[in-house]
């Protein structure tokens, strides 16, 4: 939730950051969080910066907007009664990591909130049907510092050079059509923070490149669905998948309301 983007969807992008652009009536960030929650991961740290106040306000009102309530203003009560809620049982920490901070610097700034445990990390503008539990199992099996999910997509992005599952280098797209790209959905060991310097550090160009050079970056090849949202065409495509009930990443069911 940290990328300053062009006006993706006209006026909508001018008032909110890309992760808060809605698909199917909810921010794409919410869809990503629902994916992780499906596999039991319900504690989130959001690296906010540009339009960070919008993200905080959205979560501040999340409980209210997902609950049936009565507002009683009679006799000067000014009372709010909550009857039932469809609230997700999450813990969400939103950190202002700065307006101009680069990706690596943003991750560095949340170090004290992460602690000394391995953690999951992804970008706030792409959805995927990768099986998170299998991704974690794979990461544990090789013992390296970092694992990223790699997909083969026709995207205008840098591609990965991989040997035996190990990411060796990053290259420009025109050098290798059909080569896998970094889709996010990473598992990172706390040692990753040693590769991050200051606010000018670009995670992909500095940390991941150094990890690849040292043989500490592995790839998890995903052959299923992945799609980022870089433009209006991709937003409309994701909207259509949700409207037709064909969104591969939407594994969760509607929650049963909790009566209070």
Predicted regions and their residues:
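Short, small-residue-biased leader/transition segments that mark boundaries at the very start
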Residues: 1-15
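N-terminal glycine-rich phosphate-binding loop and ensuing alpha1 helix
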Residues: 11-12, 16-64, 94
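Conserved beta-loop-beta/alpha segment of the NTase-like Rossmann-fold superfamily
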Residues: 54-164
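Catalytic-core segments of class I nucleotidyltransferases/pyrophosphorylases
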Residues: 118-120, 127, 131-140, 153-155, ...
């Amino acid at each position: 939730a940290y990328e300053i983007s062009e006006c993706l969807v006209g006026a909508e992008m001018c008032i909110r950051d890309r992760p808060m652009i809605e698909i199917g009536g909810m921010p794409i960030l919410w869809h990503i969080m629902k994916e992780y929650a499906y596999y039991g991961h319900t504690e989130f740290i959001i690296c906010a910066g540009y339009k960070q106040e919008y993200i905080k306000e959205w979560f501040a009102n999340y409980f209210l907007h997902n609950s049936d309530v009565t507002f009683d203003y009679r006799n000067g009560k000014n009372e709010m009664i909550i009857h039932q809620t469809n609230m997700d049982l999450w813990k969400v920490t939103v950190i202002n990591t700065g307006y101009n901070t680069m990706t690596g610097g943003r991750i560095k700034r949340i170090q004290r909130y992460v602690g000394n445990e391995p953690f999951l990390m992804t970008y706030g503008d792409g959805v995927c049907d990768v099986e998170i539990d299998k991704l974690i199992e794979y990461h544990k099996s090789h013992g390296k510092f970092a694992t990223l999910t790699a997909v083969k997509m026709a995207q205008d992005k840098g591609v990965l050079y991989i040997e035996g599952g190990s990411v060796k280098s990053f290259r420009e797209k025109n050098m290798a059509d059909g080569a896998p790209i970094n889709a996010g959905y990473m598992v990172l060991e706390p040692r990753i923070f040693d590769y991050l310097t200051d606010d000018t550090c670009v995670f992909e160009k500095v940390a991941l490149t150094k990890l690849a050079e040292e043989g500490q970056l592995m790839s998890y090849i995903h052959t299923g669905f992945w799609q980022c949202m870089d433009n209006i065409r991709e937003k409309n495509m994701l909207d259509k998948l949700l409207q037709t009930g064909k969104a591969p990443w939407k594994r969760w069911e509607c929650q049963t309301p909790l009566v209070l």
